[in-house]
């Protein structure tokens, strides 16, 4: 079903920029890297990235709890305190850069990765495994991109890059 929907949208002129995002009229905004922006989100469930700080307002994935989360957010009086966040280590910043860029249709810029982290992304063990499954490919313009099949599995692929420390934080998060 997913692949059929992707094909239908692409046949109708949509550009796939991530697993779930398709844009009909691509602009220069679609070309922006997913790894550099300072992203400040507002609202219930908003997720922000400010340098090495990552934080989010409370959110839920439980349908019956969503209204309560929104009500709690609406009752907040002090928005200057980040209650759900952490400072990312250098390794976490590396993993976040990989996840955010690899999941984005432009892919990961190998030169930028080396500039930031001092080594080639070709040394990333998981990249070799993903290439063997034909889920990623190197492009002529120096990027590592998901293949069409890789994009279909991007929820799974993204999980592979989550470190044990972050996984523990995710598992202990209270919805």
Predicted regions and their residues:
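A short, conserved structural fragment
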Residues: 131-141
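Accessory beta->alpha helical hairpin/"wing" motif in late/C-terminal subdomains of nucleic-acid enzymes
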Residues: 139-157
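Non-catalytic, well-ordered alpha-helical scaffold segments
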Residues: 92-100, 124, 151, 155
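Extended hydrophobic-aromatic, low-complexity segments
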Residues: 110-111, 122-123, 138-139
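Short, amphipathic alpha-helical interaction segments positioned at domain boundaries
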Residues: 151-175
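Short amphipathic alpha-helical interaction segments
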Residues: 117-132
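C-terminal scaffold of the Radical SAM
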Residues: 1-117, 174
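Ser/Thr-centered flexible coil motifs
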Residues: 87-89, 147, 163
């Amino acid at each position: 079903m997913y692949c059929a929907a992707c094909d239908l949208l692409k046949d109708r002129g949509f550009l796939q920029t991530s697993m779930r995002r398709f844009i009909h009229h691509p602009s220069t905004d679609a070309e922006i890297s997913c790894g550099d922006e300072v992203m400040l989100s507002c609202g219930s469930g908003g997720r922000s990235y400010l340098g090495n700080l990552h934080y989010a307002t409370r959110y839920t994935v439980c349908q019956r709890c969503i209204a309560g989360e929104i009500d709690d957010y609406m009752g907040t009086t002090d928005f200057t305190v980040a209650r759900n966040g952490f400072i990312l280590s250098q390794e976490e910043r590396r993993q976040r850069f990989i996840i955010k860029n690899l999941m984005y249709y432009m892919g990961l810029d190998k030169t930028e990765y080396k500039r930031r982290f001092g080594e080639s992304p070709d040394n990333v063990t998981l990249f070799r495994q993903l290439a063997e499954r034909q889920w990623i490919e190197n492009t002529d313009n120096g990027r590592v991109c998901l293949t069409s099949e890789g994009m279909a599995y991007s929820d799974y692929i993204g999980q592979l890059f989550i470190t044990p420390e972050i996984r523990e934080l995710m598992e202990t998060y209270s919805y």
